[in-house]
From Swiss-Prot:
Involved in targeting and insertion of nascent membrane proteins into the cytoplasmic membrane. Binds directly to 7S RNA and mediates binding of the 54 kDa subunit of the SRP. This is Signal recognition particle 19 kDa protein. It is found in: Cytoplasm. GO terms for biological process: SRP-dependent cotranslational protein targeting to membrane. Keywords: Cytoplasm, Ribonucleoprotein, RNA-binding, Signal recognition particle. The keyword Cytoplasm applies. Pfam families: SRP19 (PF01922). GO terms for molecular function: 7S RNA binding. InterPro entries: Signal_recog_particle_SRP19, SRP19-like_sf, SRP19_arc-type. The keyword Zinc does not apply. Belongs to the SRP19 family. GO terms for cellular component: signal recognition particle.
Amino acid sequence: MKKRGGRILWLVYLDSSVPRSRGRILPRSKAVSKPTLQEVIQALERLGYRYQVYQDKKYPALWFEERQGYIVVETSEKLRILALKVAEEVRKLRR
């Protein structure tokens, strides 16, 4: 999904505990268990992306979950490629 010249990256896209039917876009083997907004922000900074954070929003299909927020990443890359890079970087941060 695009927003103002960028890609919207919801935490759900990277979360291995969320089924694909609820919004995860990565294979479970490449996804991350319960990523936080701060981890994703650190990963984006390490990867050198420009972004904007929206902390007060919830993913529509999972409106009842506590975790919230999304990030608009300024890139022309496909969303899946971006999500793979970010998930890999989050895994590196957790080591």
